[in-house]
């Protein structure tokens, strides 16, 4: 399909064009072919035309760290710090999950993400073959990561490699994968060494939690006399490209390790606040030119998958933490939620900008809303004024997924019904 979005404000996230006050975007198949100021003067025959008047186009948002299947546990285990929350609530009930549960939960997550402009998500969970199915059925870009933890790590690593082989054969263009060891405190040294070697051998990126809480840092320090970053460096995890979630408790040397290895940091401000884990020193990492992107974490610790909320929280929290209103601008937050996320997760595809030859993942926001007027600074409006309900068009991989707030190929009512029935099965048994 070829799509023309005309009469639209365009936030390109590209330094050369930045914001186009009124222009057009031409999409052919899965790529952006033209982005220009003014009117499209070419032949409009056979084009699917979207009138963008009163709307703003942004690159599709990239949720760089989540656990989509955990929508089941939204609001479950409230009011506990991370370690108690995991040990007393989450891990025991997760043992009851089956593949079909994760599929239905991920369907709900996909709806929630698409509705608020997220077109790509980086997942770490169980039964990831079900997540593959959902990504393809719902036409959302998915980075698939089998969660590797505990004594079953060898089986889980094999599962990750097997899924990666299938993804490489997939023709949808929507899928990639990462090797996803859960964390340094849920895996042995031997396991992490083996995972590091396998990731390097397979040329796969790694997705891992690092230094989320002070408890984690203390556990690793007591066991290995190293910080989590120092320990992971010693076992070879950083020999591959790494996307590190949280990174709340880092020493100066830890930040140097991340910088030297080209590691991307995934900032999860709402989850870190809700679990009282702490505040990551994001502004300092940005000053060091560490690539910082943004994630929601799972709904059980957030409790939503709204990247627009995450941008606002993320920037306000840094301003407050440093007591400096100049820290982490709205434009930088949007970059973290788009291009920086794509840069962290995807190696050989152009994603995260509205620019010629980039993948056509685009969201349109309706600016004709009380909370979106006036438009003195469009980046500020998107980050501080929007709440996600303004998203009324979503395009993923060159296909229109949502039009005027309605899903084109997804039976939303069926998804909601199936999810509610599945929750009865989980919580009543």
Curated annotation (Swiss-Prot):
Its EC number is 3.5.4.28, 3.5.4.31. It comes from the Bacteria. It catalyses: S-adenosyl-L-homocysteine + H2O + H(+) = S-inosyl-L-homocysteine + NH4(+); S-methyl-5'-thioadenosine + H2O + H(+) = S-methyl-5'-thioinosine + NH4(+). InterPro entries: Amidohydro-rel (IPR006680), Deaminase_MtaD/DadD (IPR023512), Metal-dep_hydrolase_composite (IPR011059), Metal_Hydrolase (IPR032466), MTA/SAH_deaminase (IPR050287). Its cofactor is Zn(2+). Zn(2+) binds at residues 65, 67, 209, 297. GO terms for molecular function: 5'-methylthioadenosine deaminase activity; metal ion binding; S-adenosylhomocysteine deaminase activity. Disulfide bonds: none annotated. Keywords: Hydrolase, Metal-binding, Zinc. Binds 1 zinc ion per subunit. It is an enzyme of class 3 (hydrolase). Substrate binds at residues 94, 182, 212, 297. Pfam families: Amidohydro_1. HAMAP family: MTA_SAH_deamin (MF_01281). Belongs to the metallo-dependent hydrolases superfamily. MTA/SAH deaminase family. Catalyzes the deamination of 5-methylthioadenosine and S-adenosyl-L-homocysteine into 5-methylthioinosine and S-inosyl-L-homocysteine, respectively. Is also able to deaminate adenosine. This is 5-methylthioadenosine/S-adenosylhomocysteine deaminase. It comes from Clostridium tetani (strain Massachusetts / E88). The lineage of its organism: Bacteria, Bacillati, Bacillota, Clostridia, Eubacteriales.
């Amino acid at each position: 399909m070829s799509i023309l979005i005309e009469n639209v404000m365009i936030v390109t996230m590209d330094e050369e064009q930045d914001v186009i006050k009124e222009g057009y975007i031409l999409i052919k198949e899965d790529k952006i072919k033209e982005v220009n100021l003014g009117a499209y003067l070419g032949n409009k025959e056979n084009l699917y035309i979207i009138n963008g008047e009163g709307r703003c186009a942004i690159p599709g948002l990239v949720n760089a760290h989540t656990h989509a299947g955990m929508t089941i546990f939204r609001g479950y285990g409230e009011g506990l710090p991370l370690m108690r929350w995991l040990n007393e609530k989450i891990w025991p009930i997760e043992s009851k999950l089956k593949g079909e549960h994760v599929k239905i939960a991920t369907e709900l997550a996909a709806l929630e993400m698409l509705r608020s402009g997220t077109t790509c998500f980086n997942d770490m969970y169980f039964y990831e073959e079900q997540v593959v199915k959902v990504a393809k059925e719902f036409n959302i870009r998915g980075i698939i990561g089998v969660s590797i933890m505990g004594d079953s790590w060898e089986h889980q690593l094999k599962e990750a490699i097997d899924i990666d082989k299938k993804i490489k054969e997939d023709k949808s263009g929507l899928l990639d994968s990462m090797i996803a060891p859960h964390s340094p405190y849920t895996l042995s040294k031997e396991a992490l060494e083996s995972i590091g070697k396998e990731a390097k051998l397979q040329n796969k990126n790694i997705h891992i939690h690092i230094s989320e809480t002070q408890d984690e840092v203390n556990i690793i320090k007591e066991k290995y006399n190293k910080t989590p970053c120092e320990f992971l460096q010693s076992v070879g995890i950083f020999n591959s490209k790494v996307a590190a979630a949280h990174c709340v408790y880092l020493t100066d040397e830890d930040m140097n390790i991340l910088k030297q290895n080209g590691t991307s940091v995934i900032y999860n401000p709402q989850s870190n606040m809700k679990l009282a884990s702490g505040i990551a020193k994001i502004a300092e990492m940005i000053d060091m030119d560490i690539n910082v992107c943004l994630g929601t974490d799972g709904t059980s610790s957030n409790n939503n998958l709204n990247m627009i909320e995450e941008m606002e929280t993320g920037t306000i929290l840094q301003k407050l933490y440093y007591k400096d209103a100049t820290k982490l601008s709205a434009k930088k937050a949007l970059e973290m939620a788009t291009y920086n996320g794509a840069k962290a997760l995807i190696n050989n595809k152009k994603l995260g900008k509205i620019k010629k030859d980039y993948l056509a993942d685009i969201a349109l926001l309706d600016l004709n809303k009380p909370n979106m007027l006036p438009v003195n600074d469009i980046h500020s409006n998107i980050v501080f004024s929007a709440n996600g309900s303004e998203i009324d068009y979503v395009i993923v991989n060159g296909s229109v997924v949502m039009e005027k707030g309605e899903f084109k190929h997804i039976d939303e009512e069926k998804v909601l019904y199936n999810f509610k029935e599945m929750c009865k099965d989980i919580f009543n048994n």
